[in-house]
């Protein structure tokens, strides 16, 4: 077997017996391929184990035959745009290993996972509260109301919620988890859905207000965004109660 053929074999599902045979091959090139293969397999196994561990909270409900929704938000800190929340119900068939805290994923990876989550989830709900609402009732309360909106948008009612460090104003049992998107696959899936949904909204706003660089900053106070604010002033989607936007209304 040539080294090229060994490489092709190792790109498939090989058995331990096949590996044992290959390990007898004295060629340096073959041994390097085997070491690389075993490293990749160890990495994949660790990823699978971490993924399964992030079902620990969900399993508490699944074992009772209950559904639980993960809830998360994105857009608390920006100077412009809405706060967006998502509620996602998954079950034991959910197998998207790459689902994790959205902040740990590249924009490309989030975009790849978004339709897959929508397809595999039992139900997905979205909540959106505008900059005007945020200014009216404050970001914390707008966040809570958007989370409630997302839960109510689910077409299947959950028995309980797993929430990333918040309390949602709905009549359901809740477990609040600090850094929940790193501890629960349901919350992680919700964080990805909310992030991609909000990024798309900000891309749409960029077509109306192209000066502020929303596709690059998502409404956060980057230098580009602040410079545009100084030059052009705030738009209707800017949060009037957030500094330095608030300086324009004094």
UniProtKB/Swiss-Prot annotation:
A divalent metal cation binds at residues 72-73, 164. Residues 66-250 form the RNase H type-2 domain. CDD domains: RNase_HII_bacteria_HII_like. One of its GO terms (cellular component) is cytoplasm. Its EC number is 3.1.26.4. It is an enzyme of class 3 (hydrolase). One of its GO terms (molecular function) is manganese ion binding. It comes from the Bacteria. It catalyses: Endonucleolytic cleavage to 5'-phosphomonoester. Its main location: cytoplasm. SUPFAM superfamilies: Ribonuclease H-like (SSF53098). InterPro entries: RNase_HII, RNase_HII/HIII, RNase_HII/HIII_dom, RNaseH-like_sf, RNaseH_sf. Its cofactor is Mn(2+); Mg(2+). GO terms for biological process: DNA replication, removal of RNA primer; mismatch repair. Pfam families: RNase_HII (PF01351). The keyword Ribosomal protein does not apply. Keywords: Cytoplasm, Endonuclease, Hydrolase, Manganese, Metal-binding, Nuclease. It is found in: Cytoplasm. Manganese or magnesium. Binds 1 divalent metal ion per monomer in the absence of substrate. May bind a second metal ion after substrate binding. Endonuclease that specifically degrades the RNA of RNA-DNA hybrids. Belongs to the RNase HII family. This is Ribonuclease HII. It comes from Lactobacillus helveticus (strain DPC 4571).
């Amino acid at each position: 077997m040539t080294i090229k053929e060994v490489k092709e074999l190792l790109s498939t599902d090989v058995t331990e017996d096949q590996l044992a045979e290959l390990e007898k091959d004295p060629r340096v090139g073959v041994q390097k391929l085997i070491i690389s293969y075993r490293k990749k397999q160890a990495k994949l196994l660790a990823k699978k184990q971490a993924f399964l561990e992030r079902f620990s909270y969900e399993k508490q409900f699944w074992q009772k035959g209950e559904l639980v929704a993960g809830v998360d938000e994105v857009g608390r800190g920006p100077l412009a745009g809405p706060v967006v929340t998502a509620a996602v119900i998954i079950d034991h068939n959910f197998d998207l290993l790459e689902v994790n805290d959205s902040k740990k994923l590249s924009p490309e990876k989030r975009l790849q996972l978004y339709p897959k989550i929508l397809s595999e989830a039992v139900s997905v709900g979205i909540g959106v509260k505008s900059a005007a609402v945020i200014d009216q009732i404050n970001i914390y309360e707008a966040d809570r109301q958007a989370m409630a909106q997302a839960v109510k948008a689910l077409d299947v009612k959950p028995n309980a919620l797993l929430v990333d460090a918040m309390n949602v104003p709905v009549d359901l049992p809740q477990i609040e988890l600090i850094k929940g998107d790193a501890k629960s696959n349901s919350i992680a899936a919700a964080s990805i859905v909310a992030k991609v949904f909000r990024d798309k909204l900000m891309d749409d706003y960029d077509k109306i207000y192209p000066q502020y660089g929303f596709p690059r900053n998502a409404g956060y106070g980057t230098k580009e965004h602040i410079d545009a604010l100084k030059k052009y002033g705030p738009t209707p989607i800017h949060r009037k109660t957030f500094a330095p936007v608030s300086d324009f209304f004094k």
